[in-house]
């Protein structure tokens, strides 16, 4: 799964429980890059997207992402039974191994999460007040600058990709 976040120049994510900034061009780019694939977010994040945007809202998104990605051997049978019962219902991406999905994160999250193996970062070219940070340790993550573009309310925004270094290449 690919996580999407917006950070400032000092890796700030939130201040006093709120996003630092937003930009409508970023919202458009997120919808463009995820077109045709599930885009999960919290109800808080949903408010910045158009009403007709094809997004999926999950309450306690970060909590669900923190659940173990793999079941113990003793839990496999129980998990298979549960999956059979839910077969006809829409499942969340972390219950669908191998399905390409995206999630927009606007709250504190653990980078050691096994479910998210790639991050897309929209980086504001400013420093905002922040009390929640998301730092990518250089030893664990490879950084790639994809592009710098003009936003609606920001002169420049960097689009970066971070991938786990130990990620298997196929």
Each predicted region: which residue ranges?
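Enzymes that bind and transform nitrogen-containing heteroaromatic metabolites
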Residues: 1-170
């Amino acid at each position: 799964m690919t996580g999407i976040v917006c950070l400032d120049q000092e890796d700030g994510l939130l201040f006093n429980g709120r996003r630092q900034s937003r930009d409508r061009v970023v919202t458009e780019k997120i919808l463009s890059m995820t077109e045709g694939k599930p885009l999960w977010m919290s109800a808080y994040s949903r408010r910045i997207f158009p009403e007709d945007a094809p997004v999926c809202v999950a309450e306690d998104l970060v909590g669900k992402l923190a659940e173990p990605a793999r079941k113990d051997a003793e839990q496999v049978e129980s998990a298979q039974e549960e999956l059979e019962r839910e077969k006809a219902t829409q499942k969340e991406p972390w219950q669908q191994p191998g399905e390409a999905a995206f999630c927009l994160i606007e709250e504190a999250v653990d980078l050691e999460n096994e479910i998210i193996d790639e991050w897309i970062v929209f980086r504001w070219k400013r420093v905002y007040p922040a009390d929640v940070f998301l730092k990518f340790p250089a030893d664990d993550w490879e950084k790639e600058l994809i592009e710098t573009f003009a936003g609606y309310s920001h002169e420049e925004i960097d689009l970066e990709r971070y991938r786990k270094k130990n990620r298997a290449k196929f």
